[in-house]
């Protein structure tokens, strides 16, 4: 009721109140006269005969009830009249209050709609200012006239007119010059610290040229604006070429709970203005007109662009070279070339993307409370991020990991290796365990490690023990396989086969070529010389020493095959001409080569384990058992620590103890086998080259033999190709002799042929 009485009342409301008060005074008198009339009528009928008995016993008792009833009726009527008048007055007051409030709201909504219209172009604005006047809801607010060359501005104050009820009063002001006009503008800008609103020259609902003119002083200002700007009055002000100094910062005011979105950014082109935004609520419209956001930061200040507005690209690291002016260079003609690249494509491929860049429209939509709370990092941020990535790639939860550590279940080796790589140091573990804040604020990696270490204090030592168990069986199996390969390779090299025959041919040919020198009459040679045979060329350069030796061995094996074929039948030599003898020799040579090539060409297949042994790492073989023994001891220490943790770790300790007992037995047997095989390798190497083991890899012998066999296979392929070529040509000419030194007739002794299939019994 008090709030209702504080509102301004219509001018006719006092008259209405006076009428109701008159009615209140009139109704009680009328009711009193009506209540007395029945009593007066009863007293105007006297009778002389019956008067004494009527007055004493009959008339005196009814007088008291009539008087009391008349008093009560009068009180009831008075009370009813007062209640009726009060209720009527209250209803009338509420009704006129609502009517007055609706009228004010209609006027206010009309004023707000005028401030939300699109801006008027400069030319149209000037034309409308000269030719017409401004209306607000049909009421004239101001006139601009031209009287004898002077700009005359008529306006009226709406609130003054509402109080004085003078609708047609105007005030005249003549502006004599530019200086006076500037003073007027400057004085008005001091009074109003907000943007100056220009009222449209036509009605708000039908006008298409509405604009809001902002003061130049506030275009560069970054402070907040006053909370209220009167939109009922207007001022049409000419733009000042020299803006006045900025006013002092206004007092900050409390912003509304739901701030309206900022106005759309202005475009640089001169195209048509964008359509107006949809109408907002009353509070949003008033708050948007009262406060304005500062202009957005320039585009060049973003992290993805340089200061001159160009997109920042990835750098190309090179060393700049200054061109030499003394002579011409290839770079002199490059600047004058016609080549050009696609700059947009280059920016799309190599340009940095601006992180966190926001448009001005969505800068104020988000509230500070919606931002996610900052996470707490105990580890290094980069290590924490890498740890979180590894944990997500595991495909298992923290509870599953804790259960596996408690029960001693088997993990996949890859999972254990990933967990071992992210194991924190002792200092980091202690820092994580000492954290006493809210664990929900921890980062993902820190939260995972915190709960894991709280459940299992020696979690990562257990992971190392489980990793040892997962890797043990593949390692011990590979170690035993390598030992077996070395044993078989030594057995292949101990046999006196075709390989020894090749060594004999090389030794004899080498002594023949080194005759008369210090290198002649050699009894043995270092096997590394086998890899140098292809470097010794013939005089004509058509063949090598390796080709010669292999071809001779092939021919020798072919002759042996022919002799074995003729042992069971008689052979008679018939006389023939020299021409026929030559033809038969040529055919015999081809026959020897055809029969001997398969024998020599299949030599590498007899040394399969030798080629496998060449790929074995001696250091790995020698260190495997030592490494397994050391890791088994570490696992024992982990079990000693886990026994005192809790009762849940008993199952883990039991399983690991059983595993470690079997490991110790297997490693002991592997050490004995390793010692025996390495001793065999040493004796085999000394058999081929005495004293070559000292200071070198004991398995280097297998590498030399593997490479030499590969060279022999290649030569056999060349011999087969040449033989096929000569057979296709059908030439009967004598083959040109290879110009090597003449070998003695007993180059390939019968003893060597007879011993080619045997074995070395002295080894």
Curated annotation (Swiss-Prot):
The source's superkingdom equals Eukaryota
Mind telling me what this protein is named? Answer: Formin-like protein 4
Topology relative to the membrane: Single-pass membrane protein
Pfam families named in the record: FH2 (PF02181)
Q: Which UniProt keywords apply?
A: Cell membrane, Membrane, Signal, Transmembrane, Transmembrane helix
State where composition is biased (Low complexity): 281-292
Q: What is the lineage of its organism?
A: Eukaryota, Viridiplantae, Streptophyta, Embryophyta, Tracheophyta
Kindly state the subunit structure of this protein. Interacts with profilin.
> In what residue span(s) does the FH2 domain sit?
303-738
InterPro entries (UniProt xref)? FH2_Formin, FH2_Formin_sf, Formin-like_plant
Organism per entry: Arabidopsis thaliana
> Family assignment?
Belongs to the formin-like family. Class-I subfamily.
How would you summarize where this protein is expressed among tissues?
Expressed in the whole plant (at protein level).
BP-aspect Gene Ontology terms: actin cytoskeleton organization; actin nucleation
Q: Where is the signal peptide?
A: 1-33
- Where is there biased composition of kind Basic and acidic residues? 229-238, 316-327
Work out whether the entry's keyword set contains Cell membrane.
Answer: yes
Mind telling me which PROSITE patterns this protein's record contains? FH2
Query: Which parts of this chain are annotated as the region Disordered?
Result: 52-73, 185-327, 726-763
- Give a GO molecular function annotation for the protein: actin filament binding
Chief localization: membrane
Specify residue ranges for compositional bias: Pro residues.
Answer: 240-280
Describe its function: Might be involved in the organization and polarity of the actin cytoskeleton.
Q: Which GO terms describe its cellular component?
A: cytoskeleton; plasma membrane
